[in-house]
Amino acid sequence: MKVFKIAIYSFLISGSLWSCIPSYSAYPREYNHAKADFKKQKVFVVNKDLESEFKILKHSDIYEIVEDSTHAAKITLHPMMKRTPPCGNPMIGSMLTVGLLPSGFPYDIAYSYDLAENSTTKNYQYKLQVYQSLWLFNIFRLGRTFSKQSGKALLGSYIASNK
């Protein structure tokens, strides 16, 4: 009887953990369909060691990132500030229903960088919104990572600010 109880608890815990598959979306929703159909400026990223920020910039496709700094503008990334909900209560529904009940979390991101070109430096600041969804059926949306969707939100914000 004790072995049966342990097996049931193990199954429930592992099922709960496996059922909550994350997927991310850029907000507003029209940013998911934004395309970089403009001439891209060649830039060299000075501090690629900020990996998350660099991946977001790379996925945004706003600039053509080059490895040679001689004939390109220089971008200095700033650490992004991420605000998430203070607790994980929305996730409980997904865990108890083995992923059948979707739940989600909004992420508010303050993203900024400096673009230095011809002895002038311009600071760019964006407020990005990304929504994380936890749901069993997100298994069909596996390519929607945080950095890719944040990149789409950055591209959408960039296009909206340059209209």
Task: List each language-model region with its residue ranges.
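Short secondary-structure boundary motifs at beta->alpha junctions and helix caps
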Residues: 119-157
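Sec/Tat-exported extracytoplasmic proteins
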Residues: 58-61, 154, 158-163
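Amphipathic alpha-helical segments
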Residues: 48-59
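Surface-exposed short loop/turn segments
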Residues: 76-121, 137-145
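Sec-dependent bacterial lipoprotein signal peptides
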Residues: 1-22
